[in-house]
């Protein structure tokens, strides 16, 4: 099976390489100006970043290299929206906004003339111009309805390596020791899943004489811990209720499809038999992790990005840190096949973070600041922006770069943020990732393809849907309508879905009337907005 998956991925890589050319980016001649130039910027930092960008080693070195000095002001994310409103209302704008504005802000302030139309300065931006020419998805994501570009993106193909466009957020793990103790096989169908979960519940697989086993757990309101693919995919859709699906070019929410009813009936069966964690629909990740990290195994199956956050490294990948080598407690499983032969997994756009840098229209010497911004896309700058300054965090090699992993006794994210905010524009392509090994603390080397998440993705990627809703830019009018309609509709969806899954109501009997009530709230208008936006990209 593993060889087959590897072959499929290899074919997809070849297809991807044929379909999309890599951007041509290069390091500009430094300094960018012989006369030092000063600019000021507002920036919103990563949640755990408490440092001062003015003191980060990469940014200090960048100023010395380019001749462009940036005075950074950190804006707390908790007051971000308020600060945006008051800043633009005052008319006293900083030169730059970093990781500060969303598409709605860019639409409002770009089309009003407060933001610089970067698309008018592409002659000074050869790197970004090449990105637009070779990456149509990026161009679509950053171009506003007036045809102009006001924000520069961060593009990181590390998350979709090896570049076949398959982004795998969730993986499902099963307790291998419990399977072996009970003489069970890994389930491959929904029927087999029920039998395995029943055995986990009834036969005391953790051996403590207490009925404390949790056959299946997840976090309904989570991120990678959600059951959107695992429990809905076998019925031919990607849930949950509020998940936007695309099939044969048609846009719809999961809850609008009759297959959603069958999926919820299945989930309700699991719930009624006590096979789903009683807290699955209400717990947060902190509670989810706490149960998984108990010394005695409680989870029979769980859903996560890579497993270690939930049950710890040793149980997820074993002492050797490698997947499926025999000493781990939990192993990943492939998507299940449903009663009608359906077997699909989610896919979604990833790797492009828009509006990482916007420029005020009042900026002095816009040509220079555009050249400075374009230099951020150069390979050396991009690698350092995302993974730290050369010397401590990275090393240059003859073939490219070598990433240095964090020491074992420090928090890797906090360590990395000592030199960079990781928030500015950057470009990491598939070609760059392919020749970017990591040197680990024990001295061994590993490629991206060796990492746990890539191995997990190999298991689910062959089942990933080919159609999914892309990054699109809605018009100002469409954004306004979505802002008015969507929140109450989504809240109603979630409340009713959870009720049906947990036995508070009959989904089969109540579903038609509930869809009518959603339509009366404007659901069909929301779908039409997204359908029209998708059609406009073709």
Segments from the language model and where they lie:
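Positively charged n-region of N-terminal signal peptides that target proteins for export
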Residues: 1-4, 8
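Conserved N-terminal structural module of periplasmic/extracytoplasmic solute-binding proteins
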Residues: 6, 19-195, 230, 239-246, ...
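Hydrophobic core
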Residues: 9, 13-17
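Loop/turn elements at helix/coil->beta-strand transitions in domains of secreted/extracellular proteins
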Residues: 36-40, 66-71, 90-95, 113-116, ...
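Extracytoplasmic/periplasmic substrate-binding proteins
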Residues: 45-54, 158-173, 180-186, 220-276, ...
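Carboxylate/His-rich catalytic cores and anion/metal-binding grooves
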Residues: 113-142, 197-201, 209-243, 299-323
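Helix-loop-helix "hinge/cap" segment bordering the ligand-binding cleft or interdomain interface
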Residues: 119, 148-149, 153-225, 244-295, ...
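Conserved small-residue motifs centered on glycine
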Residues: 375, 379-499
